[in-house]
Amino acid sequence: MEKFTTLTGVAAPLPMINVDTDMIIPKQFLKTIKRTGLGKNLFDEMRYTQDGKEVPDFVLNKPAYRSAKILVAGANFGCGSSREHAPWAIGDFGIRCVIAPSFADIFFNNCFKNGILPIKLPQEQVDKLLDDANRGSNAIVTVDLARQVITGPDGGSISFEVDPFRKHCLLNGLDDIGLTLQREDKIAAFEESRKTSSPWL
């Protein structure tokens, strides 16, 4: 998993509340088990018409936000059915940080497991970032995970909280497999010890 230390990029505003996982990545795109290739279908039913043409007014179709790295969203983001494809699609598009007043628990946890930093902030601070994000290509925001600080286009800063263990994993690029491999020697030693103490297993 790619490390997350400091992220600087355009922030895209999506102030809708209750954006569910089917809106993030519709069910017809869940057949794949690959983490790549889903970015083009992120928010598919909002980004495209039924005949596949781009909806020009949708935020990620606007020239200023096509390369957005940060998404500033509304409350209860990622609600609905559990699907890990949702953070896969967000990450494959190029977004590595989602900021919102609240998240659905499963989506929130899945983000950390896939190298995406979800940040919960009070509504008034999210509103400030939404105002900043509406500047288009001038909406350059920096997220410093080590310092736990967001810096807006005007130089103002906002502190945020993050679980220390999840912070450690993101800073070091550790997913569940990476964490397991860190303990490979201890796992091997345990297996050898068990063979001796319990050979019938």
UniProtKB/Swiss-Prot annotation:
Subunit structure: Heterodimer of LeuC and LeuD.
InterPro entries reported in the protein's UniProt record: 3-IsopropMal_deHydase_ssu (IPR004431), Aconitase/3IPM_dehydase_swvl (IPR015928), AconitaseA/IPMdHydase_ssu_swvl (IPR000573), IPMI_Swivel (IPR033940), LeuD (IPR050075)
Lineage: Bacteria, Pseudomonadati, Pseudomonadota, Alphaproteobacteria, Rhodospirillales
Family membership noted in the UniProt record: Belongs to the LeuD family. LeuD type 1 subfamily.
Function: Catalyzes the isomerization between 2-isopropylmalate and 3-isopropylmalate, via the formation of 2-isopropylmaleate.
Keywords assigned: Amino-acid biosynthesis, Branched-chain amino acid biosynthesis, Leucine biosynthesis, Lyase
Catalytic activity: (2R,3S)-3-isopropylmalate = (2S)-2-isopropylmalate
Coiled coil start-end: none
GO biological process: L-leucine biosynthetic process
Gene encoding the protein: leuD
E.C. numbers: 4.2.1.33
GO molecular function annotations of the record: 3-isopropylmalate dehydratase activity
HAMAP family: LeuD_type1
GO cellular component entries: 3-isopropylmalate dehydratase complex
Lineage: superkingdom: Bacteria
Pfam annotation, one family: Aconitase_C
Keyword Lyase: yes
Enzyme class: lyase
Pathway as given in its UniProt record: Amino-acid biosynthesis; L-leucine biosynthesis; L-leucine from 3-methyl-2-oxobutanoate: step 2/4
Protein name, UniProt field: 3-isopropylmalate dehydratase small subunit
